[in-house]
């Protein structure tokens, strides 16, 4: 299946037991490191469902946002899947991790972009968590907020 401007679409990514185990190892390592370098207080934790799927939508202002936004869900036992631009899945190390952890690639501006929403919906319907940064990129200038979804 081809994506935007002839780019080869990424294969559909499905969670696996080994990927989930790696997610837990990396998540716990990130959690420990995060607790060492930052004083973390999770406000609104009670709003995360104890059962059933859900979507977290957040602004994307720093490169630490994925860890920061996923942190409460991870602490509550979820392995949230991110919708992320497909180029991240093509990076040598990060791409391997993104694919292994079953995050969801978005091929912007193509018919394949719809597939990412279908995948996200399946995850939520199966009781999982999905994280979306609607801007699709980071922005450091509050004057540009609210950004338009891409």
PLM regions and their residue ranges:
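N-terminal targeting/anchor module and adjacent flexible "hinge" preceding the catalytic domain
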Residues: 10-30
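Soluble, non-transmembrane catalytic domains of enzymes that act on hydrophobic metabolites at membranes
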Residues: 1-10
């Amino acid at each position: 299946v081809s994506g935007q401007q002839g780019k080869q679409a990424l294969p559909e990514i499905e969670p696996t037991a080994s990927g989930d185990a790696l997610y837990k190892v990396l998540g716990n390592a990130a959690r420990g490191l995060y607790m060492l370098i930052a004083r973390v207080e999770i406000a609104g934790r009670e709003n995360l469902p104890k059962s059933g799927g859900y979507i977290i939508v957040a602004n994307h202002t720093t490169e630490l946002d994925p860890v920061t936004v996923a942190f409460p869900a991870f602490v509550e036992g979820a392995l949230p899947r991110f919708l992320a631009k497909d180029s991240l899945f093509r990076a040598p190390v990060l791409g391997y991790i993104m694919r292994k952890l079953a995050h969801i690639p978005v091929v912007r501006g193509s018919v394949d972009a719809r597939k990412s929403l279908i995948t996200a919906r399946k995850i939520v319907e199966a009781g999982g968590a999905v994280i979306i940064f609607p801007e699709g990129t980071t922005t450091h200038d509050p004057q540009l907020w609210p950004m338009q979804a891409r």
